[in-house]
Amino acid sequence: MNTVKDILAEKGKQVWTVTPKTTLLETLKTLRTHNVGALLVVESGMVRGIISERDFAYRIAEKMACPLDEPVETWMTKEVIAVSPTISINECMQLMSREHIRHLPVVDEGNLVGIISIGDIVRAVISGQQSTILGLENYILSQRLNN
């Protein structure tokens, strides 16, 4: 796997979303139901923000409360960083590290086509390393057998 497109082909393109008016309680339930760390906030087909477990943790610590009936738009991150399916896994790692983020929506020609997480990136890197190791082991074994 070399690109975001490869990751999406492996994991699928399912994106869980909420609307800006969805309550924080419903947002938390959606995160739990789908066992995901972030949801995109979408309105009229446009990404308006992203809300993550980290957003909840920071806001609760900041306010010392979680008003569960508030709309998610009051807590979401509004400046969403998105990537193209053609971006490399290495570029994603650098971007996530530099911006201190764990989730990246994937947009192709203005259309939302998926979302990737730091966990997806780690799995892709490990898979690539395992393939490299297996290839090297096979090469070494073949060299021993030929000598």
Model-derived regions: residue spans:
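A positional/architectural concept
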Residues: N2-R48
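Tandem CBS (Bateman) regulatory domains
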Residues: M1-K13, S52-A82, S88-S97, I118-N147
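Short, charge-rich amphipathic segments
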Residues: T22-T33, M64-W75, G110-N111
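The conserved cystathionine-beta-synthase
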Residues: V18-N35, A82-H100, V107
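A glycine-centered beta-loop-beta connector
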Residues: L31-H34, L39-D55, M96, L104-D120
